[in-house]
Amino acid sequence: MGRKASGAARAVGELVAGAGSERATSPNFDLAGRVAIVTGGSRGLGRAIAFGLARAGADVVITSRRIDSCRETAAAITEETGRNALPVACHVGDWDQIDDLLAETESAFGRIDILVNNAGLSPIYRSAASVSEDLFDKVIAVNLKGPFRLMALVADRMSRSGGGAIVNVSSVAAQWPRGDAMPYGAAKAGLNNLTTAFAHAYGPVVRVNAVQPGAFFTDVAKHWDMEAFARHCRGIAQRRGGEPDEIVGAVLYLVSDAASYTTGVTIPVDGGYWQPFELAARPDA
């Protein structure tokens, strides 16, 4: 009996190993025929992600508050990749504008297969006591309230049309609270919570995941205290910050069929970050 069981286990193991080997050597990252919305898609990480999705075959909707930046990015994507790219102005903290964004997307493409919640806001402030109610509300609106509404509306549509994938762009500030990013870190921690909650609420047909970037050299890096950053790079395994293109692989994996059994997770893309540090230049007290 033990010998038979052992033989059966070995046969199953070989079958699983063979299937795993096939998947490992030929993962399906092809996004041809799919439509992706990328919020905050006109610059920084969002722009890199939008280009990456288009290069993989997706048509993309580029949205941010500035339509001129959206148009420039959309034109550049179409010129390079030949994919359709729709620029749409949208402040994700305004739920009425979210409704308009989805209406324009569906009018142009008839479907939504991928949502990347990338838009973010992390303003510099002098101290916790100096944070106004208006500033706090703006940070929560862009980083948490807006993504919640977008996920709710898009996941509902996806669940009725065969499925889809959502990726939230979080931050190491969600895991490593910092004195210079309190509202932002709290909002991103909430976004991590929503990632898991939405994965369970809309699974199995809709997959919801997050990437958790560390320090990337986007336009916000101009506000960093670079001497402090250089010192604290000693707490990063890669000993450096990231380039925007280095976020693309993780996002592409999560939205593609290669991640068909991955949902409800947050993947760090942070160079091996383990020690919190404050990047913003501190104003004089």
Predicted segments, located by residue:
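Alpha-helical segment proximal to the catalytic Tyr-Lys
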Residues: 156, 199-204, 260
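Short C-terminal tail/terminal secondary-structure segment
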Residues: 3-27, 122-125, 176, 252, ...
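Substrate-binding pocket helix/loop in short-chain dehydrogenase/reductase
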Residues: 126-128, 132-140, 166, 221, ...
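Residue(s) in the substrate-gating loop at a strand-loop-helix junction
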Residues: 171
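The beta1-alpha1 cofactor-binding region of Rossmann-like NAD(H)/NADP(H)-dependent oxidoreductases
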Residues: 67, 89-101, 133, 245
